[in-house]
Structures are given as structure tokens and as C-alpha cells.
A protein has these predicted regions:
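Extracellular polysaccharide-recognition and catalytic grooves
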Residues: 1-129, 135
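Ser/Thr/Asn(+Pro)-rich, low-complexity disordered segments
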Residues: 45, 85-222
């Protein structure tokens, strides 16, 4: 179970708020099921993000360029609020999504301690694949305390509505936009032609070009 239009802006934010609303004001099975779905979504976020940097593939209608900021999607802003309950030094500055973040301040739902632990500080190295159902693409992640590699996904044809993105390398820095982080594009300029699922344990590859941020340099190049 999960969202058909997974990781999608702006749909994720409004659906997430609806689930919080059901958890807060419904009862019985509806409250229980909404809580389980919220738990699952937050656990997936914990695995696919690094210090609130989050740039996964998503499903949504074509026609708009994907956002270039990597630290303020509508899921991130809520986790920043909940994370600040565990770490008082955590900055909750956000470039957008304040109206969604407000929900996290007044509802009784809170992610589990273990989920927040993985959001704030990865306890051990890991490599995971998270599926999103038929005619979709997986999220593939490799990371530990010092980095996270996030696969960009693969479009499955126009009817799939999958928006493939670059493979991202997140580091312990203050990068807030895609251009500030190392990333790898798929071949060509059209994301519909991309298969950016080439993330393995501690390693990633693609057929496209590599973007090196202005203030960084590659250790080796060819």
C-alpha cells in the first residue's frame, strides 16, 4: 500500500495532511489505517533522505519541470518539525511548505523514535530497494553516516507518468539546491529516455554526464 502518485509535489503534501486529519479526528479502523500509512511513508523517507536532503523519483502529470531544491519538499518540512523535538540545534528554516509544516506542530501523530533516529543519523550502512507497484520504478538507496546515494528512477513510458531524476550524492554539507550537490544525469536531455536506477552498494553509475558543484572537485576524472 502507498501513494499512486508517490513523492509528488504538490500532491504528497495535501494527501499527507489529509491522513493527519483522519488520524487526529477519526476513530477505529480509519484512524489505525491512516497511522499505518503515515508510519510507512515516514520510514521510506528516513531511508531515502540524508540530513533532510531528499530528491527521489516521483509520479505526476508531465508538463512542469521538477523543482530544483533538495531540502524543502512537503514531506521534508514536516520531518524537520518533528526532528527538532529530538535535536534543539536543528534548523527548521525552509524555503517553502510552511503551511504544511504547521500541521506537524499541532497534531498528536508523531513518527516513531526509530524513524527519527534514521532521519537524523543513520545508525549503520545500508542498501535498500523500495518498490511502488505495477508499471512504476523502485527507489534505490545506498548510504551510511557520511553520505547517501539516491537513484533517480526510470520512466516506464508516457502513460506511467514517472518523472526520472538525476542520481544524487548527498554529503554532510549545506547544499540546498540540486546544483550544489554532485549528481548524474541520464543520457540526453529528455528524462523519458532515462534509466537512472544504477545505484549499488557504495557505488553508482549512469550513461549521462556528471555535475560537479562549483565549490567541489572530483578526486579522479577520465
Amino acid at each position: 500500500y502507498g501513494f499512486y502518485e508517490f513523492n509528488s509535489a504538490p500532491y504528497l503534501g495535501y494527501t499527507y495532511c489529509a491522513l493527519l486529519n483522519l488520524y487526529e479526528f477519526a476513530s477505529g479502523d480509519i484512524r489505525s489505517l491512516s497511522g499505518k500509512l503515515l508510519d510507512r511513508l515516514n520510514w521510506q523517507y528516513a531511508l531515502s533522505s540524508y540530513k533532510f536532503k531528499h530528491f527521489p523519483p516521483n509520479r505526476r502529470r508531465f508538463g512542469k519541470d521538477f523543482k530544483k531544491n533538495i531540502d524543502s519538499d512537503y514531506h521534508t518540512v514536516m520531518l524537520k518539525v518533528w526532528g527538532s523535538l529530538y535535536d534543539e540545534s536543528l534548523s527548521v528554516n525552509m524555503s517553502r511548505g510552511q503551511h504544511h509544516a504547521l500541521w506537524a506542530t499541532f497534531v498528536s501523530y508523531k513518527p516513531a523514535d526509530k524513524v527519527i533516529q534514521w532521519v537524523l543519523d543513520k545508525p549503520k550502512p545500508y542498501f535498500v530497494k523500495m518498490g511502488h507497484g505495477f508499471n512504476s520504478c523502485p527507489e534505490i538507496i545506498s548510504g551510511d553516516k557520511s553520505y547517501l546515494l539516491s537513484a533517480g528512477g526510470a520512466n516506464q513510458g508516457r502513460r506511467s507518468l514517472i518523472v526520472a531524476k538525476p542520481i544524487m550524492l548527498f554529503l554532510d554539507d549545506d547544499a540546498s539546491e540540486m546544483k550544489h550537490a554532485f549528481h548524474m544525469f541520464g543520457p540526453g536531455d529528455n528524462f523519458i529516455d532515462w534509466n537512472n536506477t544504477g545505484v549499488y552498494k557504495d557505488f553508482a553509475c549512469t550513461k549521462g554526464k556528471v555535475h560537479i558543484p562549483v565549490n567541489k572537485k572530483a578526486l579522479k576524472s577520465s
